[in-house]
């Protein structure tokens, strides 16, 4: 079995080849995201789907990124790779857009968006001449919209998510703090969900659980191949949209 760091691949074409090989050899091909191990994200999913707390989903907003890979001091080898449009596929769009695509696909129980629209910019061309450092991706579903904000220009490092339903909102501020509010006339409630169980709270523990047969990933799990093929489809469409300036319909 194999676990790769997010995203699954540099392109949808590569992802399809990897998927074919994984299926041929009957192995799990898993993708690791830091946000998969956030108790707050799992609690948000639970409140939406198991407790039906906020009603039908209407909007998901995901913010990910920091103030730039060069600025935070990543090593030269990683920086060269991150800022190479061939090796990384794009800049902030792929580096941080993948998180929102992954979480949205999960919260939508594997449903693919109907359309993808993306706008990218390079705010710091002197640092990142070949790739974007700012990306906004909008996904549309029949009755839901997701906005993914991926950036190397945030003043702080962030990985947070907002989930809005017909009757309430849930905001996961980080890995341990979250809050929800069920209408104007209700108070905001703050939560600190307990840590996830062993095997579900860290990548190598999860991989070990899969290898030992203790965990059987469901198709829509955050690490699962099916979810991450949809992520790759979204990222590929986002790159096309940002190049053409047009919305891309998924087939």
Annotate each language-model stretch with its function.
Residues 87-94, 189-198:
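A short glycine-threonine-serine/GTX helix/turn-capping micro-motif
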Residues 36-127, 245:
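Predominantly a Rossmann-like dinucleotide-binding segment in NAD(P)-dependent oxidoreductases
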Residues 100-179, 201, 205-216:
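Contiguous beta-strand/loop segments that form the cofactor/metal-binding neighborhood of enzyme cores
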Residues 18, 44, 237-238:
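Aromatic/hydrophobic pocket-lining residues that form π-stacking "cages" and hydrophobic walls in ligand
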Residues 23-27, 51-53, 128, 139-141:
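Short helix-capping segments at alpha-helix termini
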């Amino acid at each position: 079995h194999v676990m790769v760091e997010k995203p699954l691949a540099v392109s949808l074409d590569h992802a399809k080849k990897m998927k074919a090989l994984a299926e041929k050899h009957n192995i799990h091909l898993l993708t690791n995201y830091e946000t998969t191990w956030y108790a707050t994200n799992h609690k948000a999913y639970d409140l939406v789907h198991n407790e039906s707390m906020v009603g039908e989903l209407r909007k998901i907003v995901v913010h990910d990124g920091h103030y730039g890979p060069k600025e935070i001091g990543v090593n030269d080898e990683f920086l060269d790779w991150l800022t190479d449009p061939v090796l990384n596929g794009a800049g902030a769009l792929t580096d941080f857009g993948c998180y929102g695509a992954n979480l949205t696909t999960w919260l939508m129980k594997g449903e693919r968006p109907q359309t993808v629209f993306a706008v990218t910019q390079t705010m710091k061309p002197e640092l990142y001449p070949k790739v974007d450092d700012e990306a906004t991706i909008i996904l549309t579903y029949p009755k839901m919209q997701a906005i993914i904000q991926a950036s190397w220009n945030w003043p702080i490092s962030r990985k947070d998510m907002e989930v809005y339903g017909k009757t309430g909102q849930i905001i996961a501020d980080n890995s341990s703090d979250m809050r929800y509010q069920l209408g104007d006339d209700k108070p905001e409630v703050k939560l600190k969900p307990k840590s996830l169980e062993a095997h579900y709270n860290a990548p190598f523990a999860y991989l070990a659980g899969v290898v030992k047969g203790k965990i059987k990933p469901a198709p829509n799990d955050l690490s699962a191949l099916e979810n991450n093929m949809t992520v790759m489809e979204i990222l590929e469409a986002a790159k096309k949209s940002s190049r053409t300036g047009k919305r891309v319909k998924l087939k």
